[in-house]
Amino acid sequence: QNTYHRYVSIGVGTVLGSGAQLDLLSKVEGRLHIARVGEYGLGADTTDFVARNVNGNTIAVLQGTAGSTGDPKTVALTASAVYSNAIELVSRLGLHRTRDTGFSWLPLYHDMGLMFLLAGMTTGIPAYIVPNTAFAAAPFKWMQWLTETKTTVTAAPNFAYDILGRYGKLLRDIDLSHLRVAISGGEPIDADAFDKFLEATAPFGFDRSAAAPAYGMAESACAVTMPAVGEGVHYDEVTVTPPGGGEPIRRRYAILGKPLGGMQVRIVEPNVDVPVIDGRNVGHVEIRGASMMRGYLGDADLGAGEWFSTGDLGYLIGDRLV
């Protein structure tokens, strides 16, 4: 019911898909047209397909947000914003069709999963996509798949690396020497957990320089900052005093790289109590640039060059975000 009402509220008329979730959706009475992939895939008659006339300002993607910090919203992304993020990812990662192979189990309804696929399509590199349920059922299969496909580029949230690092002793018969980029994004990065993954996979050929902790969000199509290829993972080890005082603690925060081309990041004065970090100007992270959304569906558009408040706290080391 919730999925149905969200689709209808943003103007969706047809849902293309397969599996149990589509079966459930088809049982909801209403005006949604359910189209099964098997009926519209290979062998189907597509002679009546009429391509749309689009330009850079045409809305290309409506991306739902999880609503973890408020009510769920729908991000409206233009074709130019999506394309900008894709080509800048290609540039930052140095993707090339004669060298690279991608592998992802991220769902295509998530910004990371979608942009991973689109970045691959932009360059024409082979990309293996498996259901996220396959990873959930057997997380260690991910490493086996990377081995079998000789993947060079993959991506996942922090929790996936955490699982493999925590149970790294179970890793067997894998070869990660082909992997030159492993992106960690979509959620805060646990330095200790990520290091355990790096330690567990090093004997199997994974090079620490391939690790790429990144920052992004649906409102910017996906990626905002990311290290250069080969830069690897680096941490800022600092003393943190909790808001309002308290016992200082030592923490390590992942350095999330420079902004992608066409994007800008700044830190503004916080309007709430924030942790105090010696020598660091902690504040609200704001972003703007070529990959930004037009706005939330149903709300006013972002102004040209307008800074967008992400709701996240952070600081800069030079031009790298933490």
Segments from the language model and where they lie:
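Structural core segment of the AMP-binding/adenylate-forming
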Residues: 1-45, 157-158
